[in-house]
Amino acid sequence: MKQSSFSYKKTLGIQSLMVIIPHEDDEINTAGAAIYSAVKEGIHVKCVFMTNGDWVYPAFVRFDETLRALRLLGVEKENVIFLGFPDGGNRGERSVYLHGLDKPVDAGGRTETYGCGDIVDYHYEKYGQHQKYTWNGLLADLKDVILSNRPDALMVTDFDYHVDHRMLSIAFEKVMGSILNEPGNTYEPLVFKGFAYATSYVSYKDYYERHFLSSRVYRKEMRYLDCETDNPVYEWNKRIRFPVASACRGPGLLHNVLYKALICHMSQKNIEHVRQVFNGDLIFWLRRTDNLIYKGKVTVSSGVSSYLHDFQMMNAKQIADTRPAMEDYLWMPDDKGKWCRCDFEKPQHIEAMALYGNIEGTGRILKGKFTFNNGFSIDVGPLAKQGHETLISFPPQDGITWVRFDIGETEGDGAGLSEWEILPSKYVCHPFIQICVDGHFAYDWHVYPGEAPAISCYSAEKIGELRWLLDGQEISLQELNSQIKNIKQKSVVRVELKDNPEVWCEAFIAPADIIYRMTSSVKRVIDQLGVWWEHQMEKTPHHKLKRIKTISDYRKIIQ
């Protein structure tokens, strides 16, 4: 049963989606619920794997596990692409970013991309030869696979603490920056970046809590502990939260399609993480590709101007370090009259701008001023700390042929900008809303004795006035929250936009009476026992995987 107006096709306005991930199994940790729902909506979904995941287990094991998992989510083999680069290892021992700058990496005797059986690597399938294990080779193939398919949206693993995750995040942003800065480029996909670890694979073991909870950051698994996520630029309250289909929620893990897909990756012992991966929302951070700066010419008073428009808000070289230092990402002018300017060949419509500064706290812009060719100007500052977004909104400006930013007052030696966004609109997606209880996405929520749940509404953007209904009767949010505390029977809570009722969401709220508490406890125990039993049944074949040498050996184990 549909519980909201949200859909990937209509809300995001897309017909195709590409998910780019570092290893086989990260497709589920990063975007499993999105893959499943997008396929169900008829969106053409492709999954691209950067490495063969061949650090411990043979590539043919990882490939087969992935194809079986994705088949459960609706993605067939022809829509799965393996770039064929080596797993970088636990400390980047075979990373093409760390060791493939001057010559190909030697990964167990291999120096080129490869496939197994009837699966060939991307470069060989397209060009008839394998790609060298080099950083430039990875960038070339990643750019090629994106431009060959030109998906409407991309979902990409971000800067988790694993070396390969960090490498993919950096590689993708370099490639995307290259694409967007090409003269005459018209390709501006939606880009969503999300984590596979601290909000998913190694997050809280909370699946069997009273309520189905939304994603949270497990700070013990973070490396940038003074930041809100492992990408220091991101702010938690600016994440995009997508609702999750019922098949990806339960009831129980044994009936959860994502659970069934995740445990296909037996080599990774993923069954030990199933209580952590699945949440009531799927979270990403939106990266704007409609930035008008890519259509202009940037000049600066001093410093490296390309850092202002390279699509990289951060960059690190020593990605095997626990907490890599940020390098080569910041426009940092060193003259007295510090300024940057963007000139456009054609007049532009501008509604907002965003500035991103120094991540590491060694300097910050305190005061600055934007000036437009039409005489409009606006003072800004101080910029947000830790490189966070400073969003500047103003009345829409038309006919703009140039914009200039003059830096006034600064502090520290490292004051500068990592990125400058000039935005033609404040938002890029159609509005959607989701009912929340105590901040968690609510679908079927039971109120336990002594609880005082607070109902609210999430939206990814600023929205108009809301209309709340309880069992079809209009009600104020204050009165709704008052009644929910003492709810006596299962009720339907609905919220919709007053000026656009086609944007709506519903949730079922019911009392957790003694019968419900008893039956749900029994079901929970049965489900946990089922998962435990599957775990026991998996142990022996998992140990055998470590000793296999051939595909036929593998087939005998999984039969």
Give names to the regions the model predicted:
Residues 321-432:
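Aromatic, loop-rich ligand-recognition surfaces of beta-strand-rich domains
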Residues 451-459:
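A short beta-strand segment in extracellular, disulfide-stabilized domains
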Residues 1-20, 41-44, 60-71, 75, ...:
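Metal-dependent de-N-acetylase/amidase catalytic core
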Residues 441-451:
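Short, solvent-exposed loop/linker segments at the N-terminal edge
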Residues 480-490:
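Solvent-exposed segments in extracellular or luminal domains encompassing
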Residues 472-482:
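Surface-exposed, flexible coil segments in extracellular/virion-facing regions
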Residues 501-514:
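Edge beta-strands of extracellular beta-sandwich domains
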